Swiss-Prot record:
Residues 1-19 form the signal peptide. The basal body constitutes a major portion of the flagellar organelle and consists of four rings (L,P,S, and M) mounted on a central rod. The keyword Secreted does not apply. The keyword Acetylation does not apply. NCBIfam families: PRK05303.1. Assembles around the rod to form the L-ring and probably protects the motor/basal body from shearing forces during rotation. One of its GO terms (molecular function) is structural molecule activity. It is found in: Periplasm; Bacterial flagellum basal body. GO terms for cellular component: bacterial-type flagellum basal body, distal rod, P ring; outer membrane-bounded periplasmic space. Keywords: Bacterial flagellum, Periplasm, Signal. This is Flagellar P-ring protein. Belongs to the FlgI family. One of its GO terms (biological process) is bacterial-type flagellum-dependent cell motility.
């Protein structure tokens, strides 16, 4: 009896670990964020603003703002401002956002300001792609960096030309929503997978009756829902908390060619192969020699003669055996045994895939 209970608990723990909620694997089509953007001014900087002689748009924007406030700047006035900076303001309008709610905004310097620390963003309209104003942003900027300079030396920690304003924008216009208008909703998988799409559809059909959900493709599951907003909200709340056993992922190796980083998931396996990796280095050294006559009155001329030396070296290249590996730990151990650098490892993995020894998809970003 004790042995049976132990086996049952082990199977139960394994099932719980492998199961995930539908809400963690999918999103509802049409329920999405929308990007907003605006152009504004930051004031109150401690002499770290734009150099107006190099950023004329800052002065032009300030003149326009002052004229709207009833202040006229005489023509030809050369304003030497140090406490003002032109900025771009971005934000995301969440789905179902209502008028009067607040959202966070990101403020980024547009000119040559040294820092936005201590600045205040003046009222800035935030527009969508349809050029309609959806929110108004204003407030004090929080900058996560710090810096100081004196005597030609400077120290800087993190970025000073960008910051955030928490709850810095008020929503003024609501986006029209089609939620609740139809009798079907589409669930979209975060990662395309035919097996997972079918498994989610089967899970919903077992709970809500067959025909309630249909997998349309490797990413989309169409679900029949009752009409009305409140009914659809209750229906989605139920099915999004359903548990689905996660299928094994595709074996994949991701290589970042810019940073040289290599990342692989646990499904990657290796077949037995032999690898030889050699390094070829070419060194070119050029030196200018000056040749002049020994006798001052001999009539000769001073000549500069270049001397070039080329050194070609090839190191490494010994053939090493890589054993077949069935799990990630063995794969890492086998690749580390080659003693290759991350940059060399990228070439080795590409060659392994071409030879059929790397059992994984290779993605280069």
């Amino acid at each position: 009896m004790i042995k049976f209970l132990s086996t049952f608990m082990l199977l139960l723990v394994t099932t719980v670990v492998q199961a995930e909620r539908i809400r963690d694997l999918t999103s509802v089509q049409g329920v999405r964020q929308n990007s907003l953007i605006g152009y504004g001014l930051v004031v109150g900087l401690d002499g770290t603003g734009d150099q107006t002689t190099q950023t004329p748009f800052t002065t032009q924007t300030l003149n326009n703002m002052l004229s709207q406030l009833g202040i006229t700047v005489p023509a030809g006035t050369n304003m030497q401002l140090k406490n003002v900076a032109a900025v771009m303001v971005t934000a995301s309008l969440p789905p179902f956002a209502r008028q009067g709610q607040t959202i966070d905004v990101v403020v980024s310097s547009m000119g040559n300001a040294k820092s936005l620390r201590g600045g205040t963003l003046l009222m800035t309209p935030l527009k969508g792609v349809d050029s309609q104003v959806y929110a108004l942003a204003q407030g004090n900027i929080l900058v996560g960096g710090a810096g100081a300079s004196a005597g030609g030396s400077s120290v800087q920690v993190n970025q000073l030309n960008g910051g955030r304003i928490t709850n810095g924008a008020i929503i003024e216009r609501e986006l029209p929503s089609q939620f609740g208008a139809g009798n079907t909703l589409n669930l979209q998988l975060n990662d395309e997978d035919f097996a997972m799409a079918q498994q989610i559809a089967d899970t919903i059909n077992r709970a809500r009756g067959y025909g309630s959900a249909t997998a349309l493709d490797s990413r989309t599951i169409q679900v029949n829902v009752p009409s009305g907003n409140s009914s659809q909200v209750r229906f989605l709340a139920d099915i999004q908390n359903m548990q689905v056993n996660v299928t094994p992922q595709d074996a994949k190796v991701v290589i970042n060619s810019r940073t040289g980083s290599v990342v692989m998931n646990r499904e990657v396996t290796l077949d037995s192969c032999a690898v030889a990796q050699g390094n070829l280095s070419v060194t070119v050294n050029r030196q200018a020699n000056v040749s002049q006559p020994d006798t001052p009155f001999g009539g000769g001329q001073t000549v500069v003669t270049p001397q070039t030396q080329i050194d070609l070296r090839q190191s490494g290249g010994s053939l090493q055996s890589v054993r077949s590996s069935a799990n990630l730990n063995n794969v890492v151990r086998a690749l580390n045994a080659l003693g290759a650098t991350p940059m060399d490892l990228m070439s080795i993995l590409q060659s392994m895939q071409s030879a059929g020894c790397l059992r994984a998809k290779l993605e280069i970003i």
